[in-house]
Amino acid sequence: MIPVRGLEGRKVAVLGLGRSGLATARALEAGGAEPLLWDDSPEARAKAEGQGFTVTDLTRDRAFEGVALLVTSPGIPHLYPAPNPVIARAMAAGVPVDNDIGLFFRSFATRDWDAFDQMPRVVCVTGSNGKSTTTALIHHILSEAGRPTQMAGNIGRGVLDLDPARDGEVVVLELSSYQTDLARALTPDVAVFTNLSPDHLDRHGGMGGYFAAKRRLFAEGGPDRAVIGVDEPEGLYLAGQLSVAPEDDRVIRISSGQKLERFGWSVFARKGFLAEWRKGRQMASIDLRAMPGLPGAHNHQNACAAYAACRTLGLAPRQIEAALASFAGLPHRSQTVGEKGGVRFVNDSKATNVDSAAKALQAFPKIRWIAGGLGKDGGIVALQPHLGSVVKAYLIGHSARDFALQIGATDHEICETMERAVARAAEEAQPGEVVLLAPAAASFDQYPNFEKRGEDFMEKVKALL
């Protein structure tokens, strides 16, 4: 646990009692604060009381008298589409609002600098797609190289549940826009921006607000080194804003398709090979085609980001290459479930938006595509240029009929359920084809989350193998 510093003897309100909320309460208590907990759910409140915490109704009048800070869980809106009433009440009372990420940065190793021979460092990864894989890959590479490391944030443990800092340790955090948007302190040593595509726009008031939330990680006084994906306009802009000149090697530009040889430091992938260039010289080349856990151009971008971050931490190219080869990938992200009769079944349930689905569709030459769910703003019209590899689409969920109208002349069948979609795709697939779940939609019409959707797909596939 990371005890929260600087709030000793103060009352701190905690809103939202899921994993991060309860971890925050424990860390506040360990640091000497007095946490006051609230959640709209009676079950969550009862669980907190059962663990010995004080539950206080933060919706009542004058609830914030004497309260020094409100700490809120990332899923609770503080501005758009409308502030949560408790957060609005805190703001009206002049009480500052933070989250567990902000508390982590104000507390991690801050009183122990003289205890370390080699300072602990923090790497943060944000972006629309590839965050989890990049975070897990950095952690895996560091572990394989023998470096002490922990992983947390939007993946793994809550940040305040981490163990206290060790000498020379690297903490790798995946941060969503919900987490970066509200944190009052964001001071990573290395920050990674993978890419940007429309997502969570209702929570940020539009694309500009969404980008602004991600960009906070790179604010003045932020990272010593920035790793920026420049395959979209926002990444190009961010890299330019952070650089004093093209040769500035404090910014490492990465790409999964462009040559970036003219910059001070760059890492890019083309035709299956990763190349590192620094000050006009090629420093390394790695063949990514044989890496089983990193199929497709989108995973090559993840590999470039992880490689660049680990190079800034002092790892050698060959150390990184060996670790890339042993990376198994993450569940529900280009995950091979099995193969039968020359047909491969791939679970990419995490492809919940158009951009991530497009990258999944580019990874294989002949695809039986299972798509659908709860569609997002704009539908999937933007996927039309990427449908050349799709032999047939099998559409499920709430958006099935809308998707059928948006995929043009692509052969398709409305299946409604995962069970029928898997059965029909498996029945019609030919040797050399891939049955791919890449929904391009949220899961909430039929499943509680994308993980459960992916598990259902895998269960149906394994029954056929």
Swiss-Prot record:
Main subcellular localisation: cytoplasm
InterPro entries: Mur-like_cat_sf, Mur_ligase_C, Mur_ligase_C_dom_sf, Mur_ligase_cen, MurD
Chain segments annotated as transmembrane: none
The protein's Enzyme Commission number: 6.3.2.9
Catalytic activity: UDP-N-acetyl-alpha-D-muramoyl-L-alanine + D-glutamate + ATP = UDP-N-acetyl-alpha-D-muramoyl-L-alanyl-D-glutamate + ADP + phosphate + H(+)
PANTHER family: UDP-N-ACETYLMURAMOYLALANINE--D-GLUTAMATE LIGASE
Family as reported in the entry's similarity comment: Belongs to the MurCDEF family.
HAMAP family: MurD
Protein name from the UniProt record: UDP-N-acetylmuramoylalanine--D-glutamate ligase
